[in-house]
């Protein structure tokens, strides 16, 4: 496997647990990453291994949403998400994989070639050979570039942010904007803040300006420790999901496969989920079955998010949704649960229809009181 982040490490753990001897190539993990660090309720409930992490998990039952015009509402969920630094999460998963019997080669892979039924994996130090290759090497995947070509530029989003400290106790905050399809965030971690902005398209100059304005407006007194920038898969063409992610001798998982929610940008759940399905396909000696497995399990959710992204980020809809959440406890909880990946995109309309009567009554009652 090329890549020792959540997808690669979890796959290594699962395969080693079943007696295989997987090898992970990664020269940099575990490390802090440009990532908010939010662990969704979906991930917490689905992947029990996460509960074994000895590190303190910052529980988060509340999220403040801010509309493009500045209207805000604090939503509360019935279940809590977690906030962890990626250094802690990635180290935990990689350590578990190694403990289970996975081998870590701390060398940077610079090229892969398939010759005479073997993969030649070239690092900066030497060349290795393998019969089967997994690309878990993120958005800029070398494995993907060699097999399918890179993720198209139009399907890449950009993120920019910082790690900072504050004397104030901050809440989890998400801020939407008038003219970008994305949002700014603040995730309070155990001993620092992760603050950033992600958008589906745009240039570095624009995202830095919006980020700096966000800091000036909401966090003027923080102490910035470091800044970062990164790309993220934000798929805009639903036909992207028609591409194969596996064949007889290779597989792509996590960000390398483009498996990130196109609306929320959440990728950890799908990194772990894709690893779980990949392990099943490999263990039954049918790696190509991974193509149908991931589409059946979460493909509809990613595709629905992709096709409804423009609708979701309509400024008028965002304004109305946050106003509605301020007047309806049911809709407020719905907004929280969707953000925490409790409600998949494909079930959004069904869930709203189910609760529409209750939401309407709460809205009318609240409006009359005010």
Residue ranges and their predicted role:
Residues 2-4, 11-35:
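Glycine-rich FAD pyrophosphate-binding loop
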Residues 4, 14, 18, 96-226, ...:
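Predominantly flavin-linked oxidoreductase catalytic cores and closely associated redox partners
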Residues 24, 135, 253:
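Generic enzyme active-site microenvironment
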Residues 30, 71-72, 193, 257-260:
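A short, flexible beta-alpha/helix-coil linker loop
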Residues 39-92:
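A conserved beta-strand/loop capping segment in the N-terminal third of enzymes
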Residues 111, 203-281, 288-289:
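FAD/FMN-dependent oxidoreductases across multiple families
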Residues 280-370:
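C-terminal helical "tail/cap" subdomain of flavin- and related membrane-associated enzymes
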